[in-house]
Amino acid sequence: MRAEGDGGLERFCSPGKGRGLRALQPFQVGDLLFSCPAYAYVLTVNERGNHCEFCFARKEGLSKCGRCKQAFYCNVECQKEDWPMHKLECSPMVVFGENWNPSETVRLTARILAKQKIHPERTPSEKLLAVKEFESHLDKLDNEKRDLIQSDIAALHHFYSKHLEFPDSDSLVVLFAQVNCNGFTIEDEELSHLGSXIFPDVALMNHSCCPNVIVTYKGTLAEVRAVQEIHPGEEVFTSYIDLLYPTEDRNDRLRDSYFFTCECQECTTKDKDKAKVEIRKLNDPPKAEAIRDMVRYARNVIEEFRRAKHYKSPSELLEICELSQEKMSCVFEDSNVYMLHMMYQAMGVCLYMQDWEGALRYGQKIIQPYSKHYPLYSLNVASMWLKLGRLYMGLENKAAGERALRKAIAIMEVAHGKDHPYISEIKQEIESH
């Protein structure tokens, strides 16, 4: 495993957790523990033209594939390197036209199958954990999850049968189940979705809600850096989920996606839960039952909004955000994470509608509580400072813009490393204003 020492890490059996990763040497905050090239990856459809399909570089003036006119590259080298994967989709996209719509999971799984055929031996991404060793949790899948896998398998056959040989159906069920609980989403500095990938050695790490490392991306390379001091013999933990929410919500999410309940210090003590579900200070305080009902309402509206994003207009979405905040504010403080969730969604809609002032107003309300609820070095907090900084700059408030961007840089220097291209880009934004 590549590291800035001599390995300094080992795979071990973690009590009650199965396999895990353990430090053999000390790591300071900001140290790179290791990096892992993607075993297989795919750029999300919405980012085509903004990023190179092969190296994920973000730049103007990418060249498009002459055959399908859908894939974009830095140059001929990137295009040539990407061909073994792009050929799975190039002519099918032309043939199917508008009807070409495999999910990102299906696209990624097709690439894993192609990779296994091209490179059957162990790859540099699998120094400590091989793809074939991935946990699938097959025995824990309910009928709904099994049905989703079956429809993915059908889509795989439908869109990829011309260029791929498939294993038997049982093996495909296992592979999709493995991808579902070991896949990663690659995000940019504002946490916008760029694509999906498999990083086997990164998948070896177990989860904690107080993680001691953070995973970031440099193109299609995953990098793992310490966000707490790590001593020799200590297990290395990342977080699989968004840490904003209270313990019960986090564990519902972990059970649903990864089939375990977390027993980290945060989940055992529930130290942050009271502040996360902050109740409005009223002369006549809300009763326990009213609080319970409002939490239930909040969870439902979060789910309703998630579904509504796929078919409702921006103004309808904004209305859901505003009405739900109004209703919740009878019981919840503005710093309550359920309020923050809807503010964050509203900010996203404002950004989409290019209502910069509206987005800024929401961002200003979100940033302080975010800094309190999230761990010290958090990509969620960094990306919020970054969005705020860019909004201020765009609205000609240079002083506030620079302050916010520097806050983002301070977190990113630890999480992404001081030499990350994102940091040079942000410094450039400060200089050029």
From Swiss-Prot:
Keywords: Chromatin regulator, Cytoplasm, Metal-binding, Methyltransferase, Nucleus, S-adenosyl-L-methionine, Transcription, Transcription regulation, Transferase, Zinc, Zinc-finger. One of its GO terms (cellular component) is cytosol. Pfam families: SET, zf-MYND. This is N-lysine methyltransferase SMYD2. Residues 7-241 form the SET domain. It comes from Sus scrofa. GO terms for biological process: negative regulation of cell population proliferation; negative regulation of transcription by RNA polymerase II; peptidyl-lysine dimethylation; peptidyl-lysine monomethylation; regulation of DNA damage response, signal transduction by p53 class mediator. A zinc finger (MYND-type) spans 52-90. S-adenosyl-L-methionine binds at K17, G18, R19, H137, N206, H207, Y258, F259, F260. It is found in: Cytoplasm, Cytosol; Nucleus. SMART domains: SET. Coiled coil: none annotated. The gene is SMYD2. Interacts with RNA polymerase II and HELZ. Interacts with SIN3A and HDAC1. Interacts (via MYND-type zinc finger) with EPB41L3. Interacts (via SET domain) with p53/TP53. Interacts with RB1 and HSP90AA1. Zn(2+) 2 binds at C65, C68, H86, C90. Its main location: cytoplasm. Belongs to the class V-like SAM-binding methyltransferase superfamily.
